[in-house]
Structures are given as structure tokens and as C-alpha cells.
């Protein structure tokens, strides 16, 4: 049974909800912290289905929270894995140019990395071959030595253990139902919460609207899937990524080194718009109301061609299937053949925030709140990498809101 009262109530048991709960407890040790997770265990959605890539932070312009927080987030999560004895592969990442048209984008990524202090090396084609003989590039490529790989499920499990040790009440199988005068309604009863922190991922906008926030924002879910290499298929020494289209938040189909020590890879992801928020496989978790709302919104985006949505949709149609993914990956790494990629990994869903007034995708982290509640609305990649640094930043923002109330009273 859920406790009837708590000082802080965190909704959502992904990596960000867990790090927020831990940071709240660290800064407000005399306060009680409760975390709600509607699933039977924490991290079963975006966090547990994450690619496991620990990003370095050079994709983002210096004026963004992503740029500000990713380098420190990378350092802290890598240190956490070492401290806890969790798997960590410091394999680095190559960003390769497919042709001459990609070279300006490569230079822009280097400029962004320099502006935020992220270590990067511009390599010649010969240097690339020495680092990863199978990588294909035009003239040069960018190498990120700080990019790494972790095991998301083990990170989440370790954070759950930390929460228990910190006397945080982690209530799994308990769903948020709504806001009421007597407190927060849950599937296990009403909780009188002094302050609500919303880290609900795919449902963050819905929770926020109960408190008068997210008026201009809605979650637009995107499905992502990877193909896994068959046992014995050739591996790679480092991640290999293309130069992305910097105007949208997706990094393109890439070749990712998996944990295990053998260099085994996966290729992907797809980035197809989902028709309901938890459209993982088949019709499981189907919600008619969500399907109708999201389908209508996506048809409108196609009609208006918001943020080049038609081009994104067409590109996704070309790469959505197995052959399309293999073809794209083969442009990055030699020796990628369809016969070696027959198995799909688990589907992940990106809780991408859409500004419905401006008809554009939000590129940076977004949050809103007041003296009663705080809502993390856009916590897409690299939020897993940033979990510790983002949680520290957000709890500071929460403290500012609570301090204003204390000063006024």
C-alpha cells in the first residue's frame, strides 16, 4: 500500500526519475521521497530500451542545456559504472563523411565540440583505417574518444538499489491516476504529496496538464528498432556514425558496438512515428484515443510539411525494413551483409516533445513548474547520458521555486 503522505513524489521510474529522487534526497535529507512506477519494475520503457551509448556532447550548440550537461553527465555516469563495477566499454566513436557534401557538417560538429570543451580528433582517411579498418569515409572523419557503451538495465538496477539504501520509497506497479484536492490519485490509493516531480516520459505532457502546464506541448512518440548481428559476424572496434542532419534531433542509422568484448554490433535505429505512446510490438498496449489523436496530428504535419516532416517520413520508409537498414549501415562500414542481420532487438520509443503552436520538434531539454509541481517535458537523447548532471540541474531549479515560496512566507 502506498504511504499516505510524502514530501516529494516523483512520477516515473526511468533513469531520470531515479536520479531525481536520489538528488532530492541528497539535498533534502530530512524530507521523505516516494517514487511511483506503473510497471512491475523500474526502467522498462525508454531507459531499459536505450542503445547504451554514452554520448560525449559535441552534437549540440553551446547555448543549449544538452551541450551544458552532456560532457559532465558522461564523466559522472562513466565514473558511476567504474565505482559500482558495472560494464563500461570506452570504445569511442567515429563520425564519418559519406561524401564531400558531409564535410561542412563534420567541421560544424568539430566547432561545436570545441565550444563546449569536448575532446575530438579530426582524422585523415588513413588514420581512420588504422583505427577501424572497416569504416568507410570520404577524406576524413571525426573521432570522439569519450563516447562509450554501458548496459542500461544494469545501471537502472544499481540506481534502484541506491534508492532503497537512501530510504526512498520505490513503489512499482503503482500508476499515477490524476490530481485531486486530497492529493495525488494512484492505483493504490491517494497520496498527500508536498511537491510533485513529473518524470513520466511518454506521459509527461498528460501529467503536466493536470497541473496547468504543457499547454503548448504534446509528446510525439517515435519507434526505434535495431538489427542485431548474428553470432560470429565481424565486429568493430568503435561506434561508427554518419554526419547527421543537424536541423532535426535524430542521429541517423549507425553501427553500434555492443557490450561483450567481441566487438559485436547492432545497426539502426529506425525512427518511425508511433501511432500510440507504447506501440512496442503488435497491438499490445493499444489505445484508440491515442491512436486517433496522434494520427490526426501526424496527418496535419504531413499536410503542412512541419519541420520537413514529409522528407523525414519518406526517408524512414526507405530504411524502415531490414534491407533498408542494412543498406544504410553498409555505407558506413565494409562487410555489412543482410545474412548477418536477421534478428531485431527490442523496440524503443522516443518521447519527443512537439511544440503544437510553432509546429516544430523541441531540440533541447524542456521543463516547467511552480511551487507545487515540476514537470520534465522533453528528456530525449542524450538524457540517459545526462541523468546525473540533468537531475542535479533540475533539482536546483526545484529548489529555486521552493525558496521563493519560503522567502515569501
Residue ranges and their predicted role:
Residues 19, 185-288:
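Flavin-dependent oxidoreductases
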Residues 61-72, 96-105, 142-161, 314-324, ...:
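Short beta-strand to alpha-helix junction loop
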Residues 5, 87-97, 109, 122, ...:
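Helix-loop-beta segment of a Rossmann-like dinucleotide-binding subdomain
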Residues 2-16, 34:
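Beta1/beta-strand and adjacent pyrophosphate-binding region of the FAD-binding site
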Residues 52-127, 131, 138, 252-254, ...:
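Dinucleotide-binding Rossmann-like beta1-alpha1 core, especially the glycine-rich loop
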Residues 141-195, 199-206, 388-399:
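Helical element adjacent to the flavin cofactor pocket in flavoenzyme catalytic cores
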Residues 126-129, 218-223, 228-230, 303-379:
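Flavin (FAD/FMN) cofactor-binding core of flavoprotein oxidoreductases
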Residues 25-48:
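Glycine-rich FAD pyrophosphate-binding loop
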Amino acid at each position: 500500500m502506498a504511504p499516505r503522505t510524502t514530501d516529494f513524489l516523483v512520477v516515473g521510474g526511468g533513469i531520470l526519475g531515479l536520479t531525481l529522487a536520489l538528488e532530492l534526497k541528497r539535498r533534502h535529507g530530512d524530507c521523505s521521497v516516494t517514487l511511483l512506477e506503473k510497471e512491475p519494475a523500474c526502467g522498462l520503457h525508454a531507459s531499459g530500451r536505450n542503445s547504451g551509448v554514452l554520448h560525449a556532447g559535441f552534437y549540440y550548440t553551446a547555448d543549449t542545456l544538452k551541450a551544458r550537461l552532456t560532457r559532465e553527465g558522461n564523466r559522472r555516469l562513466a565514473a558511476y559504472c567504474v565505482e559500482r563495477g558495472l560494464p563500461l566499454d570506452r570504445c569511442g566513436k567515429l563520425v564519418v563523411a559519406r561524401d564531400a557534401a558531409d564535410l561542412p557538417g563534420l567541421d560544424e560538429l568539430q566547432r561545436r565540440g570545441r565550444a563546449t570543451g569536448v575532446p575530438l580528433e579530426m582524422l585523415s582517411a588513413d588514420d581512420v583505417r588504422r583505427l577501424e579498418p572497416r569504416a568507410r569515409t570520404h577524406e576524413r572523419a571525426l573521432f570522439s574518444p569519450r563516447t562509450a557503451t554501458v548496459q542500461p538495465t544494469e545501471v537502472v538496477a544499481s540506481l534502484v538499489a541506491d534508492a532503497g539504501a537512501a530510504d526512498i520509497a520505490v513503489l512499482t506497479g503503482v500508476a499515477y491516476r490524476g490530481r485531486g484536492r486530497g492529493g495525488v490519485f494512484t492505483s493504490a490509493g491517494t497520496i498527500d504529496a508536498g511537491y510533485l516531480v513529473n518524470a513520466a516520459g511518454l506521459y509527461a505532457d498528460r501529467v503536466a496538464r493536470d497541473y496547468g502546464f504543457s499547454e503548448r506541448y504534446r509528446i510525439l512518440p517515435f519507434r526505434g528498432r535495431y538489427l542485431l548481428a548474428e553470432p560470429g559476424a565481424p565486429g568493430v572496434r568503435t561506434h561508427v556514425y554518419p554526419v547527421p542532419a543537424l536541423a532535426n534531433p535524430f542521429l541517423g542509422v549507425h553501427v553500434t558496438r555492443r557490450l561483450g568484448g567481441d566487438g559485436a554490433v547492432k545497426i539502426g535505429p529506425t525512427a518511425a512515428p508511433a501511432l500510440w505512446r507504447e506501440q512496442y510490438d503488435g497491438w499490445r498496449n493499444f489505445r484508440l484515443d491515442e491512436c486517433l489523436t496522434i494520427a490526426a496530428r501526424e496527418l496535419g504535419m504531413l499536410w503542412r510539411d512541419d519541420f520537413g516532416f514529409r522528407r523525414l517520413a519518406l526517408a524512414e520508409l526507405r530504411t524502415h525494413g531490414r534491407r533498408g537498414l542494412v543498406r544504410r549501415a553498409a555505407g558506413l562500414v565494409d562487410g555489412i551483409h543482410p545474412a548477418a542481420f536477421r534478428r531485431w532487438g527490442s523496440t524503443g520509443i522516443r518521447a519527443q516533445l512537439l511544440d503544437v503552436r510553432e509546429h516544430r520538434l523541441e531540440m533541447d531539454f524542456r521543463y516547467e513548474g511552480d511551487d507545487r509541481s515540476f514537470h520534465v517535458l522533453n528528456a530525449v537523447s542524450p538524457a540517459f547520458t545526462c541523468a546525473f548532471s540533468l537531475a542535479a540541474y533540475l533539482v536546483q531549479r526545484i529548489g529555486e521555486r521552493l525558496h521563493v515560496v519560503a522567502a515569501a512566507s
